[in-house]
Amino acid sequence: MNEMLKEELLQSIREVKDYPKKGILFKDITTLLNYPKLFNKLIDALKKRYLALNIDFIVGIEARGFILGSAFAYALGVGFVPVRKKGKLPAHTLSQSYSLEYGSDSIEIHSDAFRGIKGVRVVLVDDLLATGGTALASLELIKALQAECIEACFLIGLKELPGIQLLEEHVKTFCLLEC
């Protein structure tokens, strides 16, 4: 990815202090979405990175991973699979719990998400990688469906948190922007 695109992306992402709680500097990608030409450049850059890898599906993590992932899947001409919070998917699901700072949560994927095909090649997508808990749980769901995660792809990776290092122990990880 070229440095000019990275700088444009950084400039388009709003930072919100003390959200969702005091001490957090939230990276809000919704402002990036207001710039269609820049968003197209982002999706084109991701397409270029993954086009030759014979990807079958993009797996997007709720909720902003849906925005990036569905546009990315469309650009590649592949299917999109959502990973959602527990109780949000209507058909039979597989569930995976993960730890939060104060407790735990669960995410789910439809058990037929990859149309019952084993060995499909997927890229896991989300807007931001912080601690890695949700991404690791998503990887477990992908593995449970006997799919191969080629890479986990994030718009932003937070260097001061353990997510990048933790995730790289399990899957090749790409963060377009490391902040």
From Swiss-Prot:
Homodimer. Pathway: Purine metabolism; AMP biosynthesis via salvage pathway; AMP from adenine: step 1/1. It catalyses: AMP + diphosphate = 5-phospho-alpha-D-ribose 1-diphosphate + adenine. It comes from the Bacteria. Keywords: Cytoplasm, Glycosyltransferase, Purine salvage, Transferase. Its main location: cytoplasm. It is found in: Cytoplasm. Pfam families: Pribosyltran. Belongs to the purine/pyrimidine phosphoribosyltransferase family. GO terms for cellular component: cytoplasm. HAMAP family: Aden_phosphoribosyltr. This is Adenine phosphoribosyltransferase. Catalyzes a salvage reaction resulting in the formation of AMP, that is energically less costly than de novo synthesis. One of its GO terms (biological process) is adenine salvage. SUPFAM superfamilies: PRTase-like (SSF53271). GO terms for molecular function: adenine binding; adenine phosphoribosyltransferase activity; AMP binding. The keyword Ligase does not apply. InterPro entries: Ade_phspho_trans, PRibTrfase_dom, PRTase-like, UPRTase/APRTase. It comes from Helicobacter pylori (strain J99 / ATCC 700824) (Campylobacter pylori J99). Its EC number is 2.4.2.7.
